């Protein structure tokens, strides 16, 4: 018989840097999950990501206090910031530009994000990421 799901916990945790301090500790401690076990497994599974990159994770907690988790790809805004070499987006995106990205960089990000998006069409995903880039105040070339 399948285990009964107690809760779903959504977090963004830095790749390879999960530790029991907030936000991981309190979120998982509330559910009675072994926090150190999660941190150890998460860090092992994210060691091929760039260290410190925020990784969304969805943790399924079962009634017997066991858990499973799904690691998603980093948010598009983080990947765009990295591609443009900026720390954050513009305060007023329509009025100020903070950096430049090329359409090929956007397409590359779309290919990374295809597993997490609700479409398999690379062009549609590219347009979605293009919208994110524009709302961050980035100029798209090409």
UniProtKB/Swiss-Prot annotation:
Record GO biological process: translation
Keywords, ordered alphabetically: Methylation, Ribonucleoprotein, Ribosomal protein, RNA-binding, rRNA-binding
Molecular function per GO: large ribosomal subunit rRNA binding; structural constituent of ribosome
PROSITE patterns attached to this UniProt entry: RIBOSOMAL_L11 (PS00359)
UniProt PTM comment: One or more lysine residues are methylated.
CDD domains in the cross-refs: Ribosomal_L11
GO cellular component: cytosolic large ribosomal subunit
Source domain of life: Bacteria
NCBIfam families assigned to the protein according to its UniProt record, in alphabetical order: L11_bact
Family: Belongs to the universal ribosomal protein uL11 family.
Protein role: Forms part of the ribosomal stalk which helps the ribosome interact with GTP-bound translation factors.
PANTHER family for the chain: 60S RIBOSOMAL PROTEIN L12, LARGE RIBOSOMAL SUBUNIT PROTEIN UL11M
Name assigned to this protein: Large ribosomal subunit protein uL11
Species: Baumannia cicadellinicola subsp. Homalodisca coagulata
């Amino acid at each position: 018989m399948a285990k009964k799901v107690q809760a779903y916990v959504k977090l963004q945790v830095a790749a390879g840097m999960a530790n029991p301090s907030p936000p991981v500790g309190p979120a998982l401690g509330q559910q009675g999950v072994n926090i150190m076990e999660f941190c150890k497994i998460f860090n092992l599974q994210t060691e091929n990501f760039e260290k410190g990159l925020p990784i969304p994770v969805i943790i399924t907690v079962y009634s017997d206090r066991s858990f499973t988790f799904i690691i998603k790809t980093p948010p598009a805004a983080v990947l765009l910031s990295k591609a443009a070499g900026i720390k954050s987006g513009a305060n007023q995106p329509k009025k100020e530009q903070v950096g430049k990205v090329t359409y090929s960089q956007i397409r590359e990000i779309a290919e990374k994000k295809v597993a997490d998006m609700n479409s398999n069409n690379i062009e549609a995903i590219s347009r979605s990421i293009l919208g994110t880039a524009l709302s961050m105040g980035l100029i798209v070339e090409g």
